[in-house]
Amino acid sequence: QYLCGSWSFLDFELAVGPGVLCPRADTEVVAQAAAETLAGIAAPRVLDLCAGTGCLGLGVKRFCPAAQVTCVEKSPEAFVYLEKNARCALTGQGRQTENVLEPSALEQADVPAFDWGPSLNALRADRKPAYAVQPVQGDLFTYWETLPEGQLELIVSNPPYLTAAEMEQLQPEVAQEPAMALEAGEDGLVFYRALAQHYKNALCPGGALV
């Protein structure tokens, strides 16, 4: 995947490279199952945590074009791919213009400012991209503090889940991927505990955590 620079997910291509976890085929099933929880909701609000490439959030958006999706990723290296995929992955996949987040929507979010250098800053100011999903650089362990209660119909996440012992026995091809996207403490459950403890209040009545 890293050599190709892209990888198929559902019916679209995702940019991948060193520093981001390559999407797995079984994640497509998770995206579809998550999107099915949104049936009958006109404009569902969705949060994708530990987003990586954005595959889950973009997958939900693909199945449910009216969804308002925010994808949160901590790693600066992975965020580069998330932002690119948020801008490009669903292009030509039947999206309607009203389902694309214009720059003004992104600017209103709590997104860190990046210094791209004078020339690139000027270019970005003049030609800011539109996004299919809203990319935000943030940490699962603290991002919950920014969320109002009862506002989300769906939270999706494919967080790190390997134990410390499993990290020492990785297959060579998996060992090439970022440890930050794989390692989850001694028992592999540290991210799941944080999700269960801190994010349930952000869901509206009937909302789902997948």
Each model region followed by its residue ranges:
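SAM-dependent Rossmann-like transferase core, predominantly class I methyltransferases
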Residues: 1-66, 71-82, 116
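Internal, well-ordered alpha/beta segment that forms a basic, Gly-enriched binding/recognition surface
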Residues: 103
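Exposed boundary/loop context
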Residues: 52, 109-110, 117-120
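Short, conserved catalytic or adaptor-binding loops enriched in Gly and charged residues
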Residues: 6-8, 123-128
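S-adenosylmethionine
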Residues: 63-67, 72-94, 106, 114-116, ...
